[in-house]
Amino acid sequence: MAERRDGLATKSHLLAAARRVFAEKGYRDATSGEICSAARANAASINYHFGSKEKLYAEVWKEAFQEAIDRYPLDGGLGADASAEARLKATVQSLLRRMLDSSSLGYAGQIVLMELANPTEALELVKQDVIEPLRRRMHAIVRELVGPKAAEEQVVFCAISIIHQCLGFGFKKGKLPAMLESLDKETLLVSLTEHIYRFSVGGIRAVRPQVNAAPHVRSGECVFRAEVG
């Protein structure tokens, strides 16, 4: 029984250490030796408990993002009958809370950005477990706000614009940009949520007249009509 408890503890330490090392270095540059050293485990521990570094990486993904879903659900606890505006604000706040979390969960945002910048075989797992649920939710919200005549590219552009405003805070594991470090984090989070929400709704309102005025335009073209004349 004691041996089993020790094994579970070692596995837990490896997952915690791997989350930090993968977040800081990415999958390719992180070494099994470094992870084992950080976990204070022997060099064979990863193969024993997970089978390989790749399988450990997959477990880190599953654990981190299940934790994110449990702690900060994308729907913010709202019912399905909530307005599109309310669902948008809840989703923005959920993403910001995940990115600005100063606990070990904050490493999850860094891992996402590392994976998107330097894709590995795990990218499919990222798409399935992290990106796809967010994409479906944000596209549904945006389409409801822009209107049924919107081309798919317009929905995609708006959704990406909103999401990346939130992801930009995920680079430093919960640490704020230097110019914002003196501010109370919870107060700032509320203000950021409101700002990104209002900024995004304003952008969608600016796109909506183009959608309604030019239903015949090829997909995506009307987004750029104002710039190119």
Q: What residue ranges belong to the model's regions?
A:
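Hydrophobic/aromatic residues within well-ordered alpha-helical segments
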Residues: 53, 60, 64, 88, ...
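Short helix-capping/turn signature of helix-turn-helix
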Residues: 113-119
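Helix-turn-helix
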Residues: 2, 13, 21-55, 59, ...
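N-terminal intrinsically disordered/low-complexity leader segments
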Residues: 1-9, 209-229
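Hydrophobic alpha-helical connector segments
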Residues: 73-107, 155-159
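Short, amphipathic alpha-helical "lid/cap" segments that border enzyme active or binding sites
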Residues: 15, 85-92, 189-197, 201
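An amphipathic alpha-helix adjacent to DNA-recognition modules
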Residues: 8-16, 49-77, 124-128
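Hydrophobic/aromatic-rich alpha-helical bundle segments in the mid-to-C-terminal region
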Residues: 107, 111, 123-132, 141-197, ...
